[in-house]
């Protein structure tokens, strides 16, 4: 869940976001070590008067600064490729949900259930119940079953949008006339907030995304309840 003045990642609620967080820490540590090495070399050059006059045939140095960057790039590329594979992997999704972006709300279609479709608008501040998230709460949340693979089909009706949930590690562009795909699984029950992450007009900041994850029996109750509306 987002918090005021937050500078770190939101708590991961999916395996993908956990891997992205680990990859960020891994890459940041490599950058930190390289920065320390460069700083040490600069300080050494500034603080000593010793010079090396025979640099024309420094084959050992050339070998080091060729092989070492290659090793560093490999240590970054391998986990990155693994995460890219996880993003595109589809492992028999439990259901498919289509999200369509409009100015400035979302439409959700549960394609596995007949005539299950609704619009999701942001709740205005003056109508917001006590304790709810300002500018992030909606009148109809997208509800999914817990620990189930969900395939998202994402498109737009008018202009470019982007469907994003930071705690799930998801950010997929919604392009008019095109359908993009994302797959996720949520490992803990809860409510997860996001926003449209593509500038889409005057009310771009008022186009939140809310996903609620429920155990399967509660999800079935939600289906029965929404069918009666």
UniProtKB/Swiss-Prot annotation:
Names of the cofactor(s): Cu cation
Class of enzymatic activity (EC top level): translocase
GO biological process terms held by the UniProt record: ATP synthesis coupled electron transport
Coiled-coil annotated residue ranges, if any: none
Gene Ontology cellular-component terms listed: mitochondrial inner membrane; respiratory chain complex IV
Disulphide bridges, residue numbers: none
Principal place of residence: mitochondrion
Molecular function in Gene Ontology: copper ion binding; cytochrome-c oxidase activity
Catalytic activity: 4 Fe(II)-[cytochrome c] + O2 + 8 H(+)(in) = 4 Fe(III)-[cytochrome c] + 2 H2O + 4 H(+)(out)
Chain ranges on the Mitochondrial intermembrane side, renumbered to this chain: 1-14, 88-229
Top-rank taxon, per record: Eukaryota
Cellular localization per UniProt: Mitochondrion inner membrane
UniProt subunit comment: Component of the cytochrome c oxidase (complex IV, CIV), a multisubunit enzyme composed of 14 subunits. The complex is composed of a catalytic core of 3 subunits MT-CO1, MT-CO2 and MT-CO3, encoded in the mitochondrial DNA, and 11 supernumerary subunits COX4I, COX5A, COX5B, COX6A, COX6B, COX6C, COX7A, COX7B, COX7C, COX8 and NDUFA4, which are encoded in the nuclear genome.
Function: Component of the cytochrome c oxidase, the last enzyme in the mitochondrial electron transport chain which drives oxidative phosphorylation. The respiratory chain contains 3 multisubunit complexes succinate dehydrogenase (complex II, CII), ubiquinol-cytochrome c oxidoreductase (cytochrome b-c1 complex, complex III, CIII) and cytochrome c oxidase (complex IV, CIV), that cooperate to transfer electrons derived from NADH and succinate to molecular oxygen, creating an electrochemical gradient over the inner membrane that drives transmembrane transport and the ATP synthase.
Family note: Belongs to the cytochrome c oxidase subunit 2 family.
Name listed for the protein in its UniProt record: Cytochrome c oxidase subunit 2
Record organism: Pelomedusa subrufa (African side-necked turtle)
